[in-house]
C-alpha cells in the first residue's frame, strides 16, 4: 500500500556510509501531518486520505477552512493534499502522520515544483546546439528552422523560447538514507526538485524494483 508525507526542502548536505562512501543527501523537514478527511468510494467515488501540513494563522483562514479542520481538532493548514492507494483502515481523522512511517533504505518518489528560470532561449530551455560563432555567420543562438514551408504554419510542439521552470516534477526511485524522528527530518539520497523551503511530497515508489 502507498504511504506518504508532506514536508519542506531544507537544503543539501553530505553523510558518510558505514563503508566510508560519501553520499550527497537532500534534507526534508516533515513536521507531523494531520489527516483532515477520508474520501470514500460511497461518498466521493474514490478512496483517499487528505493530509494537512504547516499551520497557518486563523486570521488568514476563512470559515469553510476553519470548519473543515475543526472535525480533525487541529489548526488551519497552509498545504492540503490527497494521497490515494493507502490502507484506509490504518488512518483516522485527526491522526498525525510522522516521518516514522518511513525507514532507512526505503525507495520513494519525491514531487516538488522546479525552480523558475524566467523567459529563456531554446539553447538553455531545450539543450539545442548553437550555431557557428565565427565571422560571417548570421546564426548563433536562434531556434533554427521553423519547419517546412508548405503548411504555412509552425507545428505544435516546436521547441521555442519561453518560460522555463516552475513545473511540477516527480523524481522516482530515490533512497531514504536516514530518518531523524526527533527533528522530523528525512535524508534522501540525491537531489529533489525545487528551491529551499518549497513544498515536497514524499510517497512510496510506484516503480521500485
Curated annotation (Swiss-Prot):
Role description: One of the primary rRNA binding proteins, it binds directly near the 3'-end of the 23S rRNA, where it nucleates assembly of the 50S subunit.
Molecular function (Gene Ontology), one example: rRNA binding
Family from the record: Belongs to the universal ribosomal protein uL3 family.
Originating species: Bacillus velezensis (strain DSM 23117 / BGSC 10A6 / LMG 26770 / FZB42) (Bacillus amyloliquefaciens subsp. plantarum)
GO cellular component term of the entry, any: cytosolic large ribosomal subunit
Listed InterPro entries: Ribosomal_uL3, Ribosomal_uL3_bac/org-type, Ribosomal_uL3_CS, Transl_B-barrel_sf
PANTHER family found in the cross-reference section: 50S RIBOSOMAL PROTEIN L3, LARGE RIBOSOMAL SUBUNIT PROTEIN UL3C
UniProt-listed HAMAP family: Ribosomal_uL3_B (MF_01325_B)
Record-annotated disulphide pairs: none
Keyword RNA-binding: yes
Keyword Ribonucleoprotein: yes
Region (Disordered): 122-151
Keyword terms of this UniProt record: Ribonucleoprotein, Ribosomal protein, RNA-binding, rRNA-binding
GO biological process, one term: translation
NCBIfam families in alphabetical order: L3_bact (TIGR03625)
One of the Pfam families matching this protein, by short name: Ribosomal_L3
Subunit text: Part of the 50S ribosomal subunit. Forms a cluster with proteins L14 and L19.
The protein, known as: Large ribosomal subunit protein uL3
Coiled-coil intervals, chain numbering: none
